[in-house]
């Protein structure tokens, strides 16, 4: 039989026991041996939920200089104190179930 190298670089004259041709592989189970429980339903709130989202509209930068100038401006001014027309506000009310 030809010599085979092992991971350590030592030449072997016989294959490893795990490389035998007639070795059987153990079969894996096809079904879940530990099934997960179904997810629980979320508790419903007794009061309605109001979601408010604010984002800037018409906000566009065209050059790196404008990016730097606008970044400095944003650091000086509190976003809550900016002019209202710069922001769009969306309000969604989710009724109680």
UniProtKB/Swiss-Prot annotation:
Belongs to the SPAN-X family. The gene is SPANXA1. Detected in testis and sperm. One of its GO terms (biological process) is spermatogenesis. The lineage of its organism: Eukaryota, Metazoa, Chordata, Craniata, Vertebrata. A motif (Nuclear localization signal) lies at residues 37-45. InterPro entries: SPAN-X_fam. Residues 1-49 are annotated as: Disordered. Its main location: cytoplasm. GO terms for cellular component: cytoplasm; nucleus. This is Sperm protein associated with the nucleus on the X chromosome A. It is found in: Cytoplasm; Nucleus. Keywords: Cytoplasm, Nucleus.
């Amino acid at each position: 039989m030809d010599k085979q190298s092992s991971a350590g670089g030592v030449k072997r004259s016989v294959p490893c026991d795990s490389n035998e041709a007639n070795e059987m592989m153990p079969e894996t189970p096809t079904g879940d041996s530990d099934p997960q429980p179904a997810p629980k339903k979320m508790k419903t709130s007794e009061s309605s939920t109001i979601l408010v989202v604010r984002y800037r509209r018409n906000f566009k930068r065209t050059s790196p200089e404008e990016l730097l100038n606008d970044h400095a401006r944003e650091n000086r001014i509190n976003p809550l104190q900016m002019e209202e027309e710069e922001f769009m506000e969306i309000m969604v009310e989710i009724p109680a179930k």
